[in-house]
A protein has these predicted regions:
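Nudix hydrolase/Nudix homology domain
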Residues: 2-7, 54-56, 130-171
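Conserved N-terminal beta-strand and adjoining loop/helix that marks the start
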Residues: 12-45, 62, 113
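Short, charged/polar surface micro-motifs in flexible loops or helix N-caps
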Residues: 39-44, 53-54, 64, 98-99, ...
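Active-site-adjacent beta-strand/loop module that shapes the phosphate/pyrophosphate-binding cleft
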Residues: 96-127, 138-143, 161-169
């Protein structure tokens, strides 16, 4: 991971749009998405459960044709939880992979960001409500202090994102 957050933002701004047909690569059994980690002031991470799913994941989703990963990340956060992110406050954490939660036998490949909410947005975090296809919101400790914290979490969260956030200071 680069030490200068500004470089991460610039890299995300200039990333190439994701090809129209590349969200699901059936030949390689890969689902390409963008995921966004959002931590509150207590360090808890927002996870979401989509309708029809029993597991929790980061806000995010599949790209629309021509979108860059950063554009996808911002759009999905706005659609799913009603928070309008400032793209300059998105920090690219990397391209992370794990077993897909909802697509058996597939790997999810996620351009992963952490969003640093503004002071005003930190106040909004306590009153967020599920929107669009989201059925439930859950705040969890990325240190995964108990088995019940991790039981319903996506492998991408437990194997990649939470360990990364647990050793990363709050933005």
């Amino acid at each position: 991971m680069q030490k200068n957050p500004q470089n991460r933002v610039e890299a995300a701004h200039t990333a190439q749009p994701i090809a129209e047909h590349s969200a699901i690569d059936s030949a390689h059994r890969v689902v390409n998405v963008c995921a966004v980690a959002i931590r509150n002031r207590d360090g808890l991470v927002l996870t979401v459960r989509k309708q029809g799913s029993e597991g929790f994941m980061m806000p995010g989703g599949k790209p629309e044709p021509g979108e860059t990963p950063l554009q996808t990340a911002c759009r999905e956060v706005s659609e799913e939880i009603g928070l309008t992110p400032d793209p300059d406050r998105m920090h690219h954490l990397g391209l992370l992979e794990a077993a897909a939660l909802n697509e058996a036998g597939f790997t999810v490949r996620a351009e992963t960001f952490e969003y640093a909410p503004t002071d005003e947005q930190h106040e909004q975090l306590a009153t967020l409500v599920p929107q669009a296809e989201i059925a439930e919101l859950r705040w969890v400790n990325p240190a995964m202090s108990s088995p019940s914290d991790s039981a319903a979490q996506a492998p991408l969260n437990t194997e990649q994102i939470f360990p990364l956030l647990a050793r990363t200071p709050l933005p």
